Amino acid sequence: PIAGSMVLAAVLLKLGGYGIIRMMQTLPTTKTDMFLPFIVLALWGAILANLTCLQQTDLKSLIAYSSISHMGLVVAAIIIQTPWGLSGAMALMIAHGFTSSALFCLANTTYERTHTRILILTRGFHNILPMTTTWWLLANLMNIATPPTLNFTSELLIMSTLFNWCPTTIILLGLSMLITASYSLHMFLSTQMGPTLLNNQTEPMHSREHLLMALHLVPLMMISMKPELII
């Protein structure tokens, strides 16, 4: 069920990050070197989740693995225990909560009209539902972390924290962000561009679906304009 996926990606997945933040407060802040294996594992896990996204054919699985990859960055930023790292982790959890929930919602609107989640069978929607394509584009741009979104601000804070801690981590971070952009564009182009494969009449998007998307993306844009609300 789509509601379960949206709540899982937006709220429950972030509770793990919150738990790590509370747990790290009990540990010494001066000995971050002993957490080196965990930071490397978190970044490596993010890259592996991103690579898994690239080979997904199921739309919902792709979005789910995307959430996992972003949480790898969050965990790495929290473990370093600097103010910038914690601010970036908190901002990324909030930003990606909105983004992944919106993507799951869009995947469901596509599934209701095509009755399939296979990427190659859902293409050509920009000809049939142009407004849906606009929502897809906005959600994917936020997933890629393009400026001036909150996703960009949070990833910039996390990158600065990790680079300041160990400059070598920029290789893993850069690779992770490159793959994120690749699978996000692949997801958008696969579902929206190309000739449509649907022979039946597709019903238009309902007002409730537009409202649901607006309630995801408008608050995120507003927080992006004033990030000090959460950072």
Curated annotation (Swiss-Prot):
Predominant location: mitochondrion
Alphabetized UniProt keyword annotations: Electron transport, Membrane, Mitochondrion, NAD, Respiratory chain, Translocase, Transmembrane, Transmembrane helix, Transport, Ubiquinone
TM annotation in the entry: 1-21, 34-54, 63-85, 89-111, 128-148, 169-189, 211-231
GO biological process: ATP synthesis coupled electron transport; electron transport coupled proton transport
Subcellular location: Mitochondrion membrane
Sample GO molecular function, one term: NADH dehydrogenase (ubiquinone) activity
Reaction(s) catalysed by this chain's protein: a ubiquinone + NADH + 5 H(+)(in) = a ubiquinol + NAD(+) + 4 H(+)(out)
Topological type in the membrane: Multi-pass membrane protein
Pfam families: Proton_antipo_M
Family label: Belongs to the complex I subunit 4 family.
Protein name: NADH-ubiquinone oxidoreductase chain 4
Native species: Cerrophidion godmani (Porthidium godmani)
Lineage of producing organism: Eukaryota, Metazoa, Chordata, Craniata, Vertebrata
